[in-house]
């Protein structure tokens, strides 16, 4: 049996996945990119040649994988019709366009994958696919599997590093699909090793979308507006107050998870960890001092040299609040979590404080007097936007 895979996107991740998946026996890869004339440019750039994926292995060696997608197109009917697996490797803000494009053509037995998904992926998918949403299966990954960069558009991409383990959540539909975990593992190769989370809300809650806003707030929350000489260190430059804010937001995540389990027995969110535990698990080899969250972040070697997003101004630099750390992490992260918290009846004052500060910085209005009634809520992926107003609706997809 040939597994038909549609890879959505034209960026670093789409290049990498297309090349790796197309190299597997019994796999047909179609690439769907809706952006401008990207499909035409990719087709022209590749010509009659093969796509090359350069993989930097953990032992220091390099492997070259050469393959060729069957088709690269802007036409969703060609790419989606009959596809067993549809994988979105585009930023969250672009998901809506792809869901709308696939809706008329996606088959009931399709597995729809967000790689990564970001919070609210399932709500948006269910809303746009309508009646089909109950049949299809949805899989959400927490991040991209690799650090990767296009070296030559349409022809060559390099994998700089590959994660060892990656978690995914799964909502099974009523129709029978290809086996989700083993199929995705086969498409990617030996690493990362994929593990299945117990619940899709575990992935949503543990996306920790408060981290970037909290660090920005910690550094710039009381900023006097005067330029600074250079961009401050981002993670390694946090203070104890920021670590305390991160802990408070994390505790509120646990509160919401516990409330959902109490209200809706049978929904297991017991794997929702506090952020300190998460750091110890995922970065144990990189952390030099792990006795508390503050030191776990500031001594994390993988964060060395990473600085705040800034823009040049007269006299130095100033914070760039138009960066994705706020423009994506608020509407596609914190607001989604806020919506779940409201449905669960749990107050999250620390998260609210960050949202109120951040929305002012990016000129948006989501939260008004603790309620999601702002004029820009319709641009977010909170469940309420789609009519999922209760815990039951959030969990089942039935409004």
Swiss-Prot record:
Residue positions binding pyruvate: 118, 143, 212
Gene3D superfamilies with a match to the protein in the record: N-(1-d-carboxylethyl)-l-norvaline Dehydrogenase, domain 2 (1.10.1040.10), NAD(P)-binding Rossmann-like Domain (3.40.50.720)
UniProt key word NAD: yes
Pfam families: Octopine_DH
Summary of activators and inhibitors of this protein: Agmatine acts as a competitive inhibitor of the condensation reaction where the L-arginine and agmatine substrates compete for the same site.
Residues annotated as catalytic: 212
Residues the entry annotates as binding substrate: 118
pH-dependence of activity, as noted: Optimum pH is 8.0-9.5 for the forward reaction and 6.5-7.5 for the reverse reaction.
Chain positions recorded as L-arginine binding sites: 206
Keyword annotations from UniProtKB, A to Z: NAD, Nucleotide-binding, Oxidoreductase
Reactions this protein catalyses: D-octopine + NAD(+) + H2O = L-arginine + pyruvate + NADH + H(+)
Effect ascribed to mutating residue 148 to A/S: Reduced catalytic efficiency but no change in the activity. 3-fold decrease in affinity for pyruvate, 3-fold decrease for L-arginine and 2-fold decrease for NADH
Binding locations of NADH: 10-13, 35-38
Positions of transmembrane segments: none
EC number: 1.5.1.11
Effect of residue 118 to D: Drastically reduced enzymatic activity. Greater effect on catalytic efficiency for pyruvate than L-arginine or NADH
Family, similarity comment: Belongs to the lysopine/nopaline/octopine/opine/vitopine dehydrogenases family.
Function recorded in the entry: Catalyzes the reverse reaction of octopine dehydrogenation. Acts on L-arginine in preference to other substrates such as canavanine, cysteine, L-alanine, ornithine or norvaline, owing to the presence of the positively charged guanidium group.
UniProt name for this protein: Octopine dehydrogenase
Name of the coding gene: odh1
């Amino acid at each position: 049996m040939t597994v038909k895979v549609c890879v959505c996107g034209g960026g670093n991740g789409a290049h990498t996945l297309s090349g790796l998946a197309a190299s597997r026996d019994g796999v047909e890869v179609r690439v769907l990119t809706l952006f401008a004339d990207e499909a035409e440019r990719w087709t022209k750039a590749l010509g009659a040649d093969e796509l090359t994926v350069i993989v930097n292995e953990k032992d220091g060696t390099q492997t070259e994988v050469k393959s060729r997608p069957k088709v690269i197109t802007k036409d969703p009917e060609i790419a989606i019709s009959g596809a067993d697996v549809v994988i979105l490797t585009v930023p969250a803000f672009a998901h809506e366009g792809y869901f709308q494009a696939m809706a008329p053509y996606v088959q009931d037995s399709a597995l729809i994958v967000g790689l990564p998904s970001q919070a609210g992926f399932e709500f948006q998918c269910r809303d746009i696919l309508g009646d089909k949403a109950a049949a299809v299966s949805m899989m959400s990954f927490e991040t991209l599997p690799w650090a990767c960069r296009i070296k030559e558009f349409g022809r060559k991409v390099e994998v700089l590093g590959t994660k060892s383990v990656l978690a995914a959540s799964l909502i099974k539909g009523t129709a029978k699909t290809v086996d989700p975990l083993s199929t995705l593992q086969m498409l990617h190769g030996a690493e990362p090793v994929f593990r299945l989370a117990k619940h899709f809300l575990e992935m949503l809650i543990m996306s920790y979308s408060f981290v970037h806003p909290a660090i920005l707030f910690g550094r710039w929350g009381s900023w006097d507006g005067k330029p600074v000489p250079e961009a401050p260190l981002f993670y390694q430059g946090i203070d104890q107050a920021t670590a305390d804010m991160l802990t408070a937001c994390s505790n509120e995540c646990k509160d919401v998870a516990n409330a959902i389990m109490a209200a809706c027995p049978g929904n297991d969110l017991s794997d929702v960890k506090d952020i300190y535990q998460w750091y110890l698990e995922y970065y144990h080899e990189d952390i030099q001092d792990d006795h508390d969250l503050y030191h776990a972040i500031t001594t994390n070697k993988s964060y060395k040299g990473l600085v705040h997003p800034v823009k040049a101004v007269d006299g130095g630099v100033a914070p760039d609040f138009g960066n994705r750390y706020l423009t994506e992490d608020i509407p596609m992260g914190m607001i989604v979590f806020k919506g779940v918290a409201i449905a669960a009846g749990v107050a999250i004052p620390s998260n609210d404080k960050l949202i109120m500060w951040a929305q002012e910085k990016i000129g948006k209005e989501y939260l008004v007097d603790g309620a999601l009634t702002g004029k820009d809520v319709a641009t977010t992926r909170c469940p309420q936007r789609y009519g999922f107003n209760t815990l039951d609706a959030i969990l089942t997809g039935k409004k």
